[in-house]
Amino acid sequence: MPDRLPHILLCALALCCALAVGLPAAASAESTGGSVYVPPPPPAKRAKIVNGIAIPPVKAPARVKQAIEAANLIVRKPYVYGGGHTPYSAKIAKAAALDKGYDCSGTVSFALFGGKFLRSPLDSGSFMSWARPGDGSWITVYTNPGHAYVVIGGLRLDTSGGDRLAPEERRSGRGPRWRKYNRSPVGFTARHPKGF
């Protein structure tokens, strides 16, 4: 019996693991050759930053991906007060990315225009009554009369320079930049597009 004790303990442990991951009881270590299947984690709902560019989650809605792609066109542009507020049209959307710089609401507007959530740029005060109140599941604009930023797919798109937690974010300069860390929403109104 003492020689079989390690085998019995291993089988019991494998059975517990199988039950924990939802496998049928018959799928023990003995029936699977000593291994137990553990399913992969679900796909991430959070975008990733690679060399300053956001990579959208695979399962993100198409319009969310389009908003991220539009924002990627202006990332690394400098901060310019009033930048990004030229009226948009589908034909000049890419040309608008060639503005010399963007301010906070111009940055948010350009990303949202890319995802077909806006038809023309808004200033930060106008965003306070845009769309629906509260946090969205994919996109949330945080705004007050003096500043606006947006969180898309879990990443913050912001132009401000003083709240960066990571050293690489502090070195990135002012202007449209993706941030992996959120900032405090205190003093901001949260708005989101319906269904997003």
Annotate the PLM regions:
Residues 17-27:
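C-terminal segment of classical bacterial N-terminal signal peptides
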Residues 1, 19, 34-35:
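Residue-level detector of alpha-helical hydrophobic segments embedded in or interacting with membranes
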Residues 68, 102-105, 109-196:
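...with weaker cross-activation on analogous glycine-rich loops/strands in unrelated enzymes
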Residues 30-105, 113-115, 136-137, 142-145, ...:
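N-terminal capping segments
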Residues 1-12:
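Bacterial N-terminal signal peptides that target proteins for export
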Residues 13, 18-19, 106:
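Residue-level detector of bioactive/disordered segments in secreted/extracellular proteins
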Residues 5, 83-85, 126, 131:
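Solvent-exposed, flexible loop/coil residues
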